[in-house]
């Protein structure tokens, strides 16, 4: 299973990361830094549907999405279009991401930034804060019975978080824990197939006072209008923007249709 491979390799990578920079070192650095914290949760609480635009070079299911990948250029484009937050892939092996992307994008983009990675260790939460992330992704399928502990740690660190769920059991767990932002992934992490109706199916297990983010398989303005019509608060769009990032006119038309009709 792809997810198992990613998690295994992430744990191996963390062994090296901790040798290079220990948790104590990170905590010490955090105590001496005045970090620019942006309110990710607030960006998703608008009357109209909010859009989180993603920056990623590759994915396990699609391979390299953009050969001419330039995170700074993409960050500048995202600064000047009608989106509400930015998601940045930092996973190295499968998505070809880097921690450094958050810092360099934050220099050219004023919107809240989500660190998109596979969190398996609390070390990564402290690391996320150090590298300038405003929010992190917590994947229920990865954390399982550790989800509540990790969610509480994000609160202590002043980080927002999206708790990602893929099935009824995970949706109920995230709701019971009290997770304020719940991401429903329309992609099945077992085989990476997608079905946008997954969001509607799982929403009924999430209390109405939570922020719901729909992730994956969102390709058209009509997809966004459909999701808004069923009560979704925000959508995360990655590949669709990455493949069309040079067509600024097309992206603006996409966003106008998605938001102006909402």
UniProtKB/Swiss-Prot annotation:
Stored PROSITE patterns: IGPS (PS00614)
| TM regions (residue ranges) | none
Record GO biological process: L-tryptophan biosynthetic process
> Sorted alphabetically, which SUPFAM superfamilies does this protein's record hold?
Ribulose-phoshate binding barrel
| Signal sequence bounds | none
Q: Name one Pfam family in it.
A: IGPS
- Known EC number: 4.1.1.48
What are the entry keywords? Amino-acid biosynthesis, Aromatic amino acid biosynthesis, Decarboxylase, Lyase, Tryptophan biosynthesis
Q: What would be an example GO MF term here?
A: phosphoribosylanthranilate isomerase activity
According to UniProt, this protein's pathway is: Amino-acid biosynthesis; L-tryptophan biosynthesis; L-tryptophan from chorismate: step 4/5
Q: Does the keyword Lyase apply?
A: yes
Q: Which HAMAP family match?
A: IGPS_B
Q: Which PANTHER family match?
A: INDOLE-3-GLYCEROL-PHOSPHATE SYNTHASE (PTHR22854:SF2), TRYPTOPHAN BIOSYNTHESIS PROTEIN (PTHR22854)
The protein depicted here goes by the name: Indole-3-glycerol phosphate synthase
Name its species.
Clostridium acetobutylicum (strain ATCC 824 / DSM 792 / JCM 1419 / IAM 19013 / LMG 5710 / NBRC 13948 / NRRL B-527 / VKM B-1787 / 2291 / W)
């Amino acid at each position: 299973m792809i997810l198992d491979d990613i998690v295994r390799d992430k744990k191996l990578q963390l062994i090296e990361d901790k040798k290079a920079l220990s948790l104590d070192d990170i905590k010490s650095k955090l105590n001496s830094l005045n970090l620019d914290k942006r309110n990710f949760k607030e960006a998703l609480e608008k009357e109209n549907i909010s859009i989180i635009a993603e920056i990623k070079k590759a994915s396990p299911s699609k391979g390299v999405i953009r050969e001419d990948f330039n995170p700074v250029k993409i960050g500048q484009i995202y600064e000047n279009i009608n989106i509400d937050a930015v998601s940045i892939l930092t996973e190295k092996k499968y998505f070809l991401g880097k921690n450094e992307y958050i810092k360099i994008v934050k220099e050219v983009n004023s919107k809240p930034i989500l660190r998109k990675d596979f969190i398996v260790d609390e070390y990564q939460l402290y690391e996320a804060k150090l590298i300038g992330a405003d929010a992190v992704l917590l994947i229920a399928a990865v954390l399982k019975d550790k989800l509540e502990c990790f969610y509480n740690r994000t609160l202590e660190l002043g980080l927002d978080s999206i708790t990602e769920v893929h099935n009824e059991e995970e949706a109920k767990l995230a709701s019971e824990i009290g997770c304020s932002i719940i991401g429903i992934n329309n992609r099945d992490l077992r085989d990476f197939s997608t079905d946008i109706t997954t969001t509607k199916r799982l929403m009924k297990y999430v209390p109405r006072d939570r922020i719901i983010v729909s992730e994956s398989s969102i390709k058209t303005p009509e997809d966004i209008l459909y999701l808004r019509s069923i009560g979704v608060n925000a959508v995360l769009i990655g590949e669709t923007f990455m493949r069309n990032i040079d067509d600024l006119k097309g992206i603006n038309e996409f966003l106008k249709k998605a938001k102006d009709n909402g």
